Structure formats: structure tokens, C-alpha cells
Amino acid sequence: MSIIFRSDDVLIYSMAEVRRTSNLFWAVFTLLGSLGLLFVAISSYLGMDLFFISEKISDFSFIPDFIYFPFIPQGATMAFYGIAGLFSSFYFGSIIFWDIGGGFDIFNKKGKKVRFVRWGFPGKNRRIILEIPMNELHSIRIITEVKEEGIFTRTSTFESIVYLETIEQGFIPLTRIEDNLNGTQIAHKAGELSVFLGVPLFY
């Protein structure tokens, strides 16, 4: 998340939910992998040999010149996983293209409202908006949870999230674990919002 606009009365954060390099990588990786599986499955169904070894190294006796997969069961299995991977890659691509879950956090002191805008799938609920009057804001809170990981060696990790505490809506998260913010960045964001909104900061 990052600030895209700031003035004395308005503060706007951009929320990049799915448009991340890692998500784009996995979408492309899944697409290429599924196409590869479908190619092998089609070749198996048509009875084609899969030539993939260069002639320079094909003289070694332990390296086959080609690989043949019978369509039942290997080819059919690869076709199933290839089709499933293709649908998954299209799904990942669509949520990246439509920026599902992304949006803006708008803090408007002049309008005396806090507005959370999130993007959904195309249709009636494409734009999801939550508005909270500023007189319902109670505080900004940093809540830290301790999680233990590992089976044989137990290691503790501390995860902090900034929340907006309201009277009617309760606690609304303003950051996420996936944002990978360090302690300094968490404290800076919480302090920045506390000063801008004129509400106390608790941790």
C-alpha cells in the first residue's frame, strides 16, 4: 500500500491486492506448465513420439532418442491436469487484470467520512464501498500476534497489523501480513493516520 494523494484534508492510500510480481509470475508459470502438459497429452493421444534430445548427445546409450507416453493412463492424466492448470491460469489472469481486492482507502476530513473502495468481479458488485462517518472513529490500534512455527524447533514470529477502531463497525484492518511491512513502517503508518485523523494511537 502507498500514498497516492495527500493534502491537509484528504489522505488516499492505494491498495495493490493482487497486482504483484509474484502473482503475475505464478499465473504465467501455471499457463506455460498447463500448455506443456496438454501438448504431451495430445501427442500421446495421436501416438506421436516426443523428440527432445539434441543429436550431439543422443549417441549415449543411456539417453533415449524419444519418450512415448501411452494415452491411458499417463496421457489422460496429463490432459486432466493441463486443463485444470489452464483454467487456473485464466482465473489468476482475470483477477490480476480486474485487480480483484485492490482499491483505495480515502480519509476525507473535509467531507467527514472515511471511505474504503474495493474492486470485485465485473457485474453488480464490481465496486464495493464502505463509508464510515468520522464521528464514529475511536482510535488507531497496532495489534501484534505471536505465532509459533516449526515441528521440531519451535520458532516465534511477531506479526503486527494496524486497525481502525470504530464504534459501529468494530476493528477494520488497514494493513495485512502480505504487505510485508517491518516494525518501523507499521509504526509510521499508524502514527501518520493517528495524527491525520486526530484519534489516539494504542498498541
From Swiss-Prot:
InterPro entries according to UniProt: PSI_Ycf4_assembly (IPR003359)
Any one GO biological process: photosynthesis
Cellular component annotations (GO), alphabetically ordered: chloroplast thylakoid membrane; photosystem I
Location of the protein in the cell: Plastid, Chloroplast thylakoid membrane
Transmembrane region(s): 24-46, 76-98
PANTHER family associated with the record: PHOTOSYSTEM I ASSEMBLY PROTEIN YCF4, PTHR33288
Protein's recorded name: Photosystem I assembly protein Ycf4
The encoding gene: ycf4
